[in-house]
Structure formats: structure tokens, C-alpha cells
């Protein structure tokens, strides 16, 4: 299941803001870029609710897999984990998260991917 629209990041200005103003956390399989939210950037996208909410973008390069089916499967796995483990209580945190997967052969190892994702979520203090 996909992330709800109010949890997604979109737009090139948003990503430029994250790249310039973020703290980066590195793992073996992925990197996290966490930045304080800036709802003013999202006003151009005509979003009704641009409050300071936790928002996420998952970027998977073609270096990870040439097949879009596999990249989308990885994205869905991470989004499903987020939906089940980020409660509405944590949704008030005013942070934006960009997840970049590094290249590697972990398409078949879902547990390794989720373990690293969870470790980086704890490391970045987005969940407790």
C-alpha cells in the first residue's frame, strides 16, 4: 500500500532544500537525509494541509536494479514498514526524510533491508 498523500514529498524545490539543509545518516544499503520541514516550499503544489508533518520520499536508483518492477517492490516494502511502524503519534514530528538506496544485491533479502532501515530510523531519532 502506498503512503498517504500527506506523508509524501514532491517537487524539485523540496529535494533541493533537503540536499542543502539535511543531516545525513549512512548505512551499508542506504542513506537517510533528514531535514526540518519547511511547509512554505509545498505551497506551490496546492496541498490543502501543509502543516509541519513527517514526510518521506524514497529514491531508488537504476543502479540498484535495472527493472522497474524490482525497484517498485523495494519501495513498497519500505513504505509498508513506514505505515505499520510510524503511528499517528509520531506524525507530528516536523521532519522530512529522503531515503536513497545504494547499489547492491538485496532484492531477495527483505529482512536485511528492513533491519538496516529500522536501524537508521533509530539512529536518526525519527522513532524511539
Swiss-Prot record:
GO CC annotations on file: ribonuclease P complex
Keyword presence, Transmembrane: no
Record's keyword terms, sorted: Endonuclease, Hydrolase, Nuclease, RNA-binding, tRNA processing
GO molecular function: 3'-tRNA processing endoribonuclease activity; ribonuclease P activity; tRNA binding
UniProt GO BP: tRNA 5'-leader removal
InterPro entries recorded: Ribosomal_Su5_D2-typ_SF (IPR020568), Ribsml_uS5_D2-typ_fold_subgr (IPR014721), RNase_P (IPR000100)
Record keyword Hydrolase present: yes
Disulfide pairings: none
EC number: 3.1.26.5
Subunit structure: Consists of a catalytic RNA component (M1 or rnpB) and a protein subunit.
NCBIfam families: rnpA
Designated name of the protein: Ribonuclease P protein component
Gene giving rise to this polypeptide: rnpA
Amino acid at each position: 500500500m502506498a503512503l498517504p498523500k500527506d506523508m509524501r514529498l514532491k517537487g524539485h524545490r523540496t529535494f533541493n532544500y533537503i540536499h542543502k539543509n539535511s543531516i545525513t545518516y549512512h548505512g551499508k544499503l542506504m542513506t537517510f537525509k533528514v531535514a526540518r520541514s519547511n511547509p512554505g516550499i509545498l505551497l506551490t503544489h496546492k496541498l490543502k494541509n501543509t502543516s509541519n508533518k513527517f514526510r518521506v520520499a524514497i529514491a531508488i536508483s537504476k543502479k540498484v536494479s535495472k527493472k522497474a518492477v524490482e525497484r517498485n517492490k523495494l519501495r513498497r516494502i519500505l513504505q509498508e514498514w513506514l505505515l505499520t511502524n510510524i503511528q499517528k503519534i509520531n506524525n507530528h514530528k516536523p521532519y522530512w526524510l529522503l531515503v536513497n538506496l545504494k547499489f547492491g544485491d538485496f532484492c531477495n533479502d527483505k529482512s536485511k533491508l528492513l533491519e538496516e532501515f529500522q536501524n537508521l530510523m533509530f539512529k536518526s531519532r525519527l522513532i524511539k
